[in-house]
Amino acid sequence: MAQDIKNEEVEEVQEEEVVKTAEETTPEKSELDLANERADEFENKYLRAHAEMQNIQRRANEERQNLQRYRSQDLAKAILPSLDNLERALAVEGLTDDVKKGLGMVQESLIHALKEEGIEEIAADGEFDHNYHMAIQTLPADDEHPVDTIAQVFQKGYKLHDRILRPAMVVVYN
């Protein structure tokens, strides 16, 4: 019987030690789990911040490229009326050949400078395209002139790469 009491006491002590060790390891595991969760949270925040910085840099680069690509837009819009006036001056009757030649040279140099900056004249012959042309008048269509074709150009249109600076003002068969 004394032996049984001793065995029971030993078992109780062992059980208490097991319970104590389990209680001691449980908080450690939960602290470790909390630390891992916080580490994961910080890693996610870091990855998001890193991705956001990359997006900001990409957008800034795109914006810089667009500014560079379209830098001459305002200047071109200011020069186009002068180019139109030169064209009208060349169409006037009674100018001497020397004056026409001089005006033609100025016109050519302006057109060349605009082309170097990526500014092109919009083609205004054939089919009417509302993206590039502005119909300011219509004429009745017939057998020779199908519907939605351009009859006459009142003012040339220009584009800078893929941007329309000014649509071509045209007369359209309707």
From Swiss-Prot:
The gene is grpE. One of its GO terms (biological process) is protein folding. Pfam families: GrpE (PF01025). Disulfide bonds: none annotated. Its main location: cytoplasm. Keywords: Chaperone, Cytoplasm, Stress response. Residues 17-35 have a biased composition (Basic and acidic residues). Residues 1-35 are annotated as: Disordered. The keyword Lipid metabolism does not apply. This is Protein GrpE. It comes from the Bacteria. Participates actively in the response to hyperosmotic and heat shock by preventing the aggregation of stress-denatured proteins, in association with DnaK and GrpE. It is the nucleotide exchange factor for DnaK and may function as a thermosensor. Unfolded proteins bind initially to DnaJ; upon interaction with the DnaJ-bound protein, DnaK hydrolyzes its bound ATP, resulting in the formation of a stable complex. GrpE releases ADP from DnaK; ATP binding to DnaK triggers the release of the substrate protein, thus completing the reaction cycle. It is found in: Cytoplasm. The keyword Kinase does not apply. Homodimer. The lineage of its organism: Bacteria, Bacillati, Bacillota, Bacilli, Lactobacillales. One of its GO terms (cellular component) is cytoplasm. Belongs to the GrpE family.
